């Protein structure tokens, strides 16, 4: 069984940890240039502020509902993420940190009531960090993602922890989930699925494997098998290396500088944590990004830059600062980065 733990409204929740008077008040976090909304509390969502919204278009709502607006503080969020992930590592020896606010745990061999185990995790994290989380548990990673979505969507019914542990639950969940909300499907594949009348995850699962392989490649086929309950998407666990690095393929193509910088911040923070764990320091930093190689009709771009640091460090704040400087030098507009 796998558990997917997701921090709820992470950036907004981090701001509330350090200012509890914000609890119950609409909170939004803006990108570093204060251009777009990149995080919203549930209260902000309820008054109609969408993710990615240009801030100036919603200033009237900010004033009307007394919304508290913050500029993104990525070093703070990275530090809070490390605290959460460190506590979660106590619940399984096999952890994959998927993003700044998500991680997978492999629960193989842990023979307990998994619903209660999830609730125990939730209570421990919220007590230890102040960050609210949701937990989804299932036989595969894709199903754990789905279970997490249910836990987050129906907190009163689930308590924030939901387990897909029967065929009946799996089928019911697949009938509920829209294809565009399936982990890793993306807009492009969702359009293909809609075109053939596949609107729910159950429709995708019931498609022939030949069609999925032809139209969605081996990645889509592995996803389909995972949703069938056949473990196909494996855990990505850290390796012990003298050269420390963190890289991931983005879940969706990213175009804006702020979106890419957010991911770079997350990965740099994770690398800094690895440095400190083995009492090491960094003297050189390499930042690299790349476009989607499967979009052959678009211009490909795979830049990298090596930065010689003025002093050895394992400080998240320092490394993030240098990583941002490097990204500014290699980032080009009008590319979709993967």
What are these regions, as identified by a protein language model?
Residues 1-225, 235:
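Gly/Gly-Pro- and Ser/Thr-rich, intrinsically disordered tail segments characteristic of DNA damage-repair
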